[in-house]
Amino acid sequence: MEKVIAKTYAKAILERNDFENFYSNLLELSSAFASNKFIDILNSYEIKQDKKLELILSLLDNPSDAFKNFINLIVDNKREMLIPEITKELSEQKASKENTFLGQVYSKEKLSEEEIKNLEEKLSLKFNAKIRLDSKISDNDSVKISLDGLGYEISFSMQSLKAKMNEYILKAI
């Protein structure tokens, strides 16, 4: 349900002329949600909505009146905890609109910038879209590339390669 609500807000923001301003403000606010104290304050029933609104707006340098009204609407509807989800959804819709997709590369070791750029170029050609990849470290020996926006995932494991080579050699004998 929260994802549907966040999509609705994100879609409305994406159609605005001052979209970039909204997006940068939401990115700033989303970073505050990393603090447990901030979340506790927003979840508190003892703190009035107008104080929560004041706190949220105090995190921004000179927000526009339109953005203040947007945050006021969010707080009035008790949806302030959706701000990170709205930001995430807005980021995904923005990427989709610009034909840019974000993905992750999971590997045992962090990949170099050159390796990531090479993968991005090859995947961009394959999907006819701009692909951005983040390198993440995982525990297993496999390499996995995941592009959620495109529904694409590929995994390559040394163990499976060795097993296939053994099978091929045994068939050849």
Curated annotation (Swiss-Prot):
Alphabetically ordered keywords of this record: ATP synthesis, Cell inner membrane, Cell membrane, CF(1), Hydrogen ion transport, Ion transport, Membrane, Transport
Lipid biosynthesis as UniProt keyword: no
Membrane topology recorded in Swiss-Prot or TrEMBL: Peripheral membrane protein
Signal peptide start-end: none
Molecular function, one GO term: proton-transporting ATP synthase activity, rotational mechanism
Main location (coarse class): membrane
Protein purpose: F(1)F(0) ATP synthase produces ATP from ADP in the presence of a proton or sodium gradient. F-type ATPases consist of two structural domains, F(1) containing the extramembraneous catalytic core and F(0) containing the membrane proton channel, linked together by a central stalk and a peripheral stalk. During catalysis, ATP synthesis in the catalytic domain of F(1) is coupled via a rotary mechanism of the central stalk subunits to proton translocation.
Cellular component GO terms, alphabetical: plasma membrane; proton-transporting ATP synthase complex
Similarity section: Belongs to the ATPase delta chain family.
Any Pfam family hit: OSCP
Subunit structure, interactors included: F-type ATPases have 2 components, F(1) - the catalytic core - and F(0) - the membrane proton channel. F(1) has five subunits: alpha(3), beta(3), gamma(1), delta(1), epsilon(1). F(0) has three main subunits: a(1), b(2) and c(10-14). The alpha and beta chains form an alternating ring which encloses part of the gamma chain. F(1) is attached to F(0) by a central stalk formed by the gamma and epsilon chains, while a peripheral stalk is formed by the delta and b chains.
Subcellular location: Cell inner membrane
Full protein name: ATP synthase subunit delta
Species in which this protein is naturally found: Campylobacter lari (strain RM2100 / D67 / ATCC BAA-1060)
Alphabetical list of PANTHER family matching this protein: ATP SYNTHASE DELTA CHAIN (PTHR11910)
